[in-house]
From Swiss-Prot:
Keywords: Aromatic hydrocarbons catabolism, Lyase, Metal-binding. Substrate binds at residues 147, 174-175. The record marks 70 as: Transition state stabilizer. NCBIfam families: HpaI. It comes from Salmonella dublin (strain CT_02021853). It is an enzyme of class 4 (lyase). Homohexamer; trimer of dimers. One of its GO terms (molecular function) is metal ion binding. This is 4-hydroxy-2-oxo-heptane-1,7-dioate aldolase.
Amino acid sequence: MKNAFKDALKAGRPQIGLWLGLANSYSAELLAGAGFDWLLIDGEHAPNNVQTVLTQLQAIASYPSQPVVRPSWNDPVQIKQLLDVGAQTLLIPMVQNADEARNAVAATRYPPAGIRGVGSALARASRWNRIPDYLHQANDAMCVLVQIETREAMSNLASILDVDGIDGVFIGPADLSADMGFAGNPQHPEVQAAIENAIVQIRAAGKAPGILMANEALAKRYLELGALFVAVGVDTTLLARGAEALAARFGAEKNLSGASGVY
C-alpha cells in the first residue's frame, strides 16, 4: 500500500491543492482532471457525510490528484468511517494541544498502535479484504494532518510537533484571524506574522506545513517560507465569482453581498 501524498510531503515536494465544498462527485471528478496535486473534501463546513465523501473518493480515484478528507471534528468514530470508505489522508480540524493530536493519530491506527476498529471485510479501503495483509500495512499508509486555528494551539505548537504520527500541521487562517481579534482579515500584519512564524517552526521540526490561501502572492510567499501543502482556491468561490464576472460582462448588476470573504 502506498500514499502518494504522504510520500510527496516526506520528500519535501510542494503540493498545490484545491478545496472542494460542492459536495458532489460530478464536480469532484471534473476538478480532479484540472491538474492539482491534491483535493480537499471538506466535511467540516461543506454539506458532506460519509456517503458523499465516498462518491467523491470514487470519482477522484482514477486521476493523479490525491484526496484529502476533513472530518467535521476530531472524532474517532467519524475517522474510522472515513478510513473504511478509502480515505488515507485526513485533515483534523481544531486541534488545540498534544493530547488531541495524539488522539487523532490513535484513531487512524489499528491496535496495538491505536484504536481504529477492525471491519475490513466491509471496507472499501481494504477492497473488501482483497488487499493482501491490509491490516498490517494500513497504519503506515495513513497521513495525519492537524489544524492549528487558535492562539491556544499556536502556543502549544512545539508539543504538537513532538507527537509521533503527525505528518503535517495546517494553519487555519480564517479561524486564527478571528481568534486573534481580526475576524475576516487574515492578512492583518499580526496574523501574517503568526502564520509565517508557524510555517518556519513546523518545517524546522521536520513536519509539513500547510495552509489555504487564495491570495496568489501570499500563497507563493508561504511556499517560499517552506509550506509543503498549499490550497490555492475553493471550488464554490471559483464558481460564484466566475459566474458573477460573466454575468457582469453582459450587463448584469453584480450582487456584492458576501462577495468578499476570507478565501
